[in-house]
Amino acid sequence: MNYKTQREAARKGIETPEMKKAAEKEGVELKYLQEGLAAGKIALPANRNHLSLQAAAIGAGLKTKINVNLGISRDCSNMEEEMRKVEKALEMQADAIMDLSCHGKTQEFRKALLAISPAMIGTVPVYDAMGFLEKELSEITVAEFLQVVETHARDGVDFMTIHAGIRRTTLERLRKTPRLTSIVSRGGALLCTWMERNKAENPFYQYFDEVLDICREYDVTLSLGDACRPGSINDASDACQLEELITLGDLTLRAWEKDVQVIIEGPGHMPLNEIEANVLLQKKLCHSAPFYVLGPLVSDIAPGYDHITSAIGGAIAAAAGADFLCYVTPAEHLRLPSLEDMAEGIIAARIAAHAADIAKGLPGASEWDWQMSKARAELDWESMFKLAIDPEKARRYRAESSPELEDSCTMCGQSCALRNMKNL
């Protein structure tokens, strides 16, 4: 094999099995996908050690993808429960799963996940560092941070969040212009603490070339983390966030020089009216690299309903050009999500992604909606259930009611507009 990464293969005009599979899934020409990979506008996360992977691509002109977060923690360390979530996420057509495990047998869980998942798998190595190394944060050396990155890569992880964009200069800016909610990124806060305690630069920024060498060796896509993402709408689009974004743009070019694929992570909490501008800024400053957003959550008042605030922002962001949505569940800001929380979050994210694909004018995006509308016009309930994004819920709601007329529902009964027009 005379290439190390999908990007290198694309630049050399080599058609890889992963490219062919991804192009077939998307219904696009292989050449289009290949050119997008070579230009950095598309990423195809595919670690050569992830043997169960069914490759999928993220980026310009492709369907908006969704990611599901899960993993074990100190308070919730039940691996069996998290594996049930994995199975449910795959059943519900998640495109990617991020293992955010930060305590316990993290490598055991990660390997089990990689063994069964056809979806791409992402991790955040800095989360795992203290548990894996069994050391206090400030005592971890640069070499040990890199060791954890390489362990994740060797295990088969397809993409990794690396918070390389937050620097000591960013901390100085944060002191000069304080935020309402400071740093809310877990990885960002860990690195801020490490930098302050050791009076040193962010190790992932200072030793970025070493990170790139690891990513290149295993073809791990670099998901450049937004340590300065706003944790409240009050802090959105501030200097701290934008300073980091400029740094991420510079790091993107350095990664591409080594043929390492890149995704850029984005906000966060953000008012509706700022979302489109932020997407345009990211595409401009980060050279059209795929954009991966957490939400954005368009309001801060809805604990228990943040899958809704997130879906609103995600639909707007993706319609404006974001490529990858991280789901948010009703449990956001409250607890580790349950299986039921996860399912609600997935449906909300999938609706947002699909709505955005229609707005983007992707070929075939509205065909699903046409089929559903046709079934409704014909009062074809069975087809409606099969076409629903959540068939189980649609069937349950219908079964819980007893309409007077079998082909109507309990909302309108004999006054059903479609039924009456059909019978004219």
Curated annotation (Swiss-Prot):
This protein's pathway: Cofactor biosynthesis; thiamine diphosphate biosynthesis
Keyword Metal-binding listed: yes
Assigned GO CC terms: cytosol
Cofactor note: Binds 1 [4Fe-4S] cluster per subunit. The cluster is coordinated with 3 cysteines and an exchangeable S-adenosyl-L-methionine.
Top-level class of the enzyme under EC nomenclature: lyase
Required cofactor names: [4Fe-4S] cluster
Binding site for Zn(2+): 269, 333
Pfam families per UniProt: ThiC_Rad_SAM (PF01964)
Molecular function in Gene Ontology: 4 iron, 4 sulfur cluster binding; carbon-carbon lyase activity; zinc ion binding
Record keywords: 4Fe-4S, Iron, Iron-sulfur, Lyase, Metal-binding, S-adenosyl-L-methionine, Thiamine biosynthesis, Zinc
UniProt superkingdom: Bacteria
Residues reported to bind substrate: 69, 98, 127, 163, 185-187, 226-229, 265, 292
GO terms, biological process: thiamine biosynthetic process; thiamine diphosphate biosynthetic process
EC numbers: 4.1.99.17
Binding site for [4Fe-4S] cluster: 409, 412, 416
Record flagged with keyword DNA repair: no
Reaction catalysis annotation: 5-amino-1-(5-phospho-beta-D-ribosyl)imidazole + S-adenosyl-L-methionine = 4-amino-2-methyl-5-(phosphooxymethyl)pyrimidine + CO + 5'-deoxyadenosine + formate + L-methionine + 3 H(+)
NCBIfam families to which the protein is assigned, alphabetical: PRK13352.1, thiC
Family: Belongs to the ThiC family.
HAMAP family: ThiC (MF_00089)
Protein role: Catalyzes the synthesis of the hydroxymethylpyrimidine phosphate (HMP-P) moiety of thiamine from aminoimidazole ribotide (AIR) in a radical S-adenosyl-L-methionine (SAM)-dependent reaction.
PANTHER family per record: PHOSPHOMETHYLPYRIMIDINE SYNTHASE, CHLOROPLASTIC (PTHR30557:SF1), THIAMINE BIOSYNTHESIS PROTEIN THIC (PTHR30557)
Name recorded for this polypeptide: Phosphomethylpyrimidine synthase
Natural source organism: Syntrophomonas wolfei subsp. wolfei (strain DSM 2245B / Goettingen)
Organism phylogeny: Bacteria, Bacillati, Bacillota, Clostridia, Eubacteriales
